Amino acid sequence: VWFDRVSRGMYATDASIYQMMPLGVVVPRTGADVEATIAIAREHGVPVTARGGGTSQCGQTVNHGLIVDVSRYLRDVVALDTAARTVRVQPGIVLDELNRGLKKHGLFFPVDPSTASRATIGGMTANNSS
């Protein structure tokens, strides 16, 4: 958890022109960390914004509340069922990394944004990327 000005400043913008200094930044290591962050923020009326790769060009990853950066630790493939052709992942996994792993099994995630080398699945889902 970071509340210093330099750390907050790094999260004050994304790939857009928008800039907002957040109250703080949380970098969770587990889903339980995310749950605890949201519970505490709700208790204090602080808005929460999840952030993946920060590739949004419309400002969806900036706000004046807490930024929850899922891209650092929540990047794993949780389950892969090649027979059913399904994969369950954590929100911080980068699309290109996911597809490198899936390629070994003859699979791929068929969404192709120009930012695939940096865009996370969580961010893509939040923005309805296709």
Name each model-derived stretch.
Residues V1-A12:
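Conserved oxyanion/phosphate-binding beta-strand-loop segments in alpha/beta enzyme cores
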Residues V6, S114-A116:
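Active-site beta-loop-alpha junctions enriched in small/polar residues
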Residues D14-I17, Q57-V62:
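Short glycine-biased active-site loop of nucleotidyltransferases that positions the nucleotide triphosphate
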Residues S16-V48, L66, V70-S114, T125, ...:
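N-terminal glycine-rich flavin-associated loop
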Residues R51:
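Conserved PLP cofactor-binding pocket of PLP-dependent enzymes
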Residues R118-G122:
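Beta-rich nucleic-acid/ligand-interaction surfaces
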